[in-house]
Regions:
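C-terminal binding/interaction regions
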Residues: 2-68, 73, 78-81, 85-95, ...
Length: 176
């Protein structure tokens, strides 16, 4: 196997033929970071979105900035941005990339909050993992901020859940 992730069929004896398509393992199956050094720099953008289901009373408290712990959305925004900036430290084999912009947008519904995180970079690899980390961490921060309001009498969270986290946009364009 060439280790270039191109799946050229030159696997060593006994190697898994499907392993030729794996870009995060070397010839012996050990984890490795993909070499992006020869790729050209491009302008890249990724957007991820997710939702946290909450009791309607909790959403109202967030909307009215009446949660005991403080401003839920401001805190979640900071958490999302911090997560974007530190993705390379938490996702194995993820490159540290120069983040040029992060936008967060919260949409409060009747029984939940949707968070959209847009990340931009100029570099050799994409930023969708950063957008996903921002969305999931931002939603986790919302949960942390409102958990006392969401707990039932047994200390459980029967109406609370994070769902539908997905990449909704991924673009790249040559630098001008």
């Amino acid at each position: 196997m060439s280790g270039d992730g191109k799946g050229d069929g030159s696997e060593p004896d006994g190697a898994d033929p499907g392993a030729a398509d794996l870009t995060h393992t070397d010839e012996s199956g050990e984890a490795q970071m993909v070499d992006v050094g020869d790729k050209p720099d491009t302008a890249r953008r990724a957007v991820a979105r997710g939702t946290i289901r909450l009791r309607s009373e909790t959403v109202d408290a967030v909307r009215d900035n009446a949660v005991d712990k403080g401003d839920v959305l401001a805190t979640a925004r900071i958490g999302a941005i911090q997560a974007v900036k530190h993705t390379w430290e938490t996702i194995p084999m993820c490159h540290q990339i120069p983040i040029t912009n992060v936008d967060t947008d919260f949409a409060l519904g009747d029984d939940g909050i949707e968070l959209t995180v847009a990340v931009e970079t100029t570099g050799k690899t994409g930023c969708e993992m950063e957008a996903l980390e921002g969305a999931t961490t931002g939603l986790n921060v919302v949960w942390d901020m409102v958990k006392s309001a969401e707990k039932d009498a047994d200390g459980d969270y029967p109406e609370t859940g994070i769902e539908s986290v997905e990449v909704v946009e991924k673009t790249k364009r040559p630098l001008e």
